[in-house]
């Protein structure tokens, strides 16, 4: 990450680097309602392939945004959920979604 002088700005850039990609936003929006198994996430975000989804989930887990729990009731499955920190990011995600909808309605292009 590029070095910036102001530590507060550096922290902002760190948060944006975690949530600032298409599939990450899709994961956060999808997990907003409830925890999900990997296969449920794949079905909910069909354009994200398994490798990309796995990569983003690991990145989010490493950043403390998503928790990963392995369940072994009968067949083993992995459940993903937003952590309390991940839930704190939801207003940012919602704001990005609202701006995107406004731009779509007005046909404005971001410059």
Could you tell me what each predicted segment is?
Residues 2, 6-52, 63, 73-81, ...:
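N-terminal helix-turn-helix DNA-binding core of bacterial DNA-binding proteins
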Residues 7, 11, 29, 81-111:
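Amphipathic alpha-helical dimerization/coiled-coil segments
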Residues 56:
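Residues within the DNA-recognition helix of helix-turn-helix
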Residues 69-71:
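Conserved catalytic-core motifs of GNAT/GCN5-like acyltransferases
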Residues 59:
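Alpha-helical DNA-recognition elements
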